[in-house]
Structure formats: structure tokens, C-alpha cells
Amino acid sequence: MMHPVASSNPAFCGPGKPSCLNEDAMRAADQFDIYSSQQSKYSHTVNHKPMVCQRQDPLNETHLQTTSGRSIEIKDELKKKKNLNRSGKRGRPSGTTKSAGYRTSTGRPLGTTKAAGFKTSPGRPLGTTKAAGYKVSPGRPPGKKQQAFRCSSDA
């Protein structure tokens, strides 16, 4: 809510004084005239000279090739440095071959796929699980005794 403010300043405009609104309109028009006259004053003195441009593409292309070639070499060197002395649970140490016998993180020999049937270390027939009753070491189902060979001549 607006309250009327009393002031002795004649430039103060309150609500309902049309003379103040007219003064504002005149001031705004005067300001625009000043700007337009200044623009016309400067527009005559400014001269636009055509600039001569020289292309330096061959220099830039060779520079780009050398820097990009260096960055690729640096990236390769960083990868090699990161893999030094690497061993542990994540694969075989760097510098060893697949034939060295390191297994993948899933437990099957390297060079084999899941489709080959290696679900765990191959101590039981491929494609079987622990729930099938196979122990890891013997290679035969538990519960079956070794049958002695009987000769038919003993009977």
C-alpha cells in the first residue's frame, strides 16, 4: 500500500500530479536526441579499411601433427608404466603369457569361454556343479566304491 510522501522538493512526483509525468516524457526524449546526435558524429569519422589476411594453414597443420603424435606416444608410455609389477587377483602379472597357466577371474583356464563349460576349476566333469555331488579331487562321483576286478575263473 502506498502512502503519500510530503516533500518541499518541486522535482518530487507524487501520485496524481500530471505535470511530473510530462516532465519525465520530455527528459526521455531529450536523452534520445543526444544519443542519436553522438552516433551520427562518430559514424562519419570511422573509416573501415579492408584487412589483408594471410593463411598459415601449413604451419598449423604440421604443429598439430607433432603435438598429437607426441600425446599418443605419452599415453602409450603411461599405459606401459602402469602395468609394471602387476599381480594379484585381477588376472596374470604383466609380462607373463597365457601358457603360463594363470586363470581368469572366473576360475577357468585362459583361452576358454563360459560356453566351454568351465564353471569352476576343472576337477570334476565339465558342466557339473558342486550340487551334483562331485568332489573336486577324485574325479568320480562320491558314494561309489571301487569295484574289485573279479575273474570269471574264481566263480
Curated annotation (Swiss-Prot):
InterPro entries: DUF5568 (IPR040419). Pfam families: DUF5568. The modification Phosphoserine is found at S37, S121. Keywords: Isopeptide bond, Phosphoprotein, Ubl conjugation. Residues 1-20, 40-155 are annotated as: Disordered. There is a cross-link at K75 (Glycyl lysine isopeptide (Lys-Gly) (interchain with G-Cter in SUMO2)). The keyword Phosphoprotein applies. The keyword Phosphoprotein applies. Belongs to the UPF0461 family. This is UPF0461 protein C5orf24 homolog.
